[in-house]
């Protein structure tokens, strides 16, 4: 490779290391060692995107504006590619997010499973770009929604019940291979979810203001947007 590119050993070593950091290759040692091409994983790609997204003012509303467009089509495209393996995974996800008291899971588990249901469908979608976009939004929502778990528990319960019911309906339509019904149900589900999450945000804002008022004994602090990425910090003396 040094001869092929006309570079020295040090330059080649640095180039290979850069490719390894990006997840494009895996370096092995030993007599039969060398560089092996690796498939870049979704998790690694998301880590890189986080560096960009950290400086963007992205809200729940921004993400749901995309979800209402992407998710119904993603689910519809996935239907012909769902087999028993996918149906079993969807059933398990629904069971994990069951809101009935005898089967209740912690709020964090329920919210993550709500999104995992959508990831299972996305993985079956034959359109790789649509699949990636849906999974990217789900991963961002996972962080934002879990960060609001200390908002009103009543709203979390309502969100869980609505999602559980919608997921059961979507799964039933998918088993019947009813593509148009899956698309319709998914759109209704996303719209309803946004309404519940808007209430969660509102409840969290009220709670933050009330807590601050009680601690400070003065006027409430200005309303904040708790689900926005914080601004980067600078070190003193930098």
Where are these regions (language model features)?
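Short linear motifs at protein or domain termini
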Residues: 1-70, 76, 80, 205-207, ...
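Hydrophobic alpha-helical elements and their junctions with loops/disorder across both membrane
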Residues: 22, 82-85, 200
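Short, charged helix-to-loop "capping" segments that act as catalytic/coupling loops
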Residues: 24-35, 42, 102-107, 144-159
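Short, solvent-exposed segments of well-ordered alpha helices
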Residues: 54-61, 108, 154-157
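Conserved amphipathic alpha-helical segments that form helical-bundle/coiled-coil interaction surfaces
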Residues: 63-148, 163-172, 181-195
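C-terminal all-alpha effector/ligand-binding and dimerization domain
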Residues: 140-238
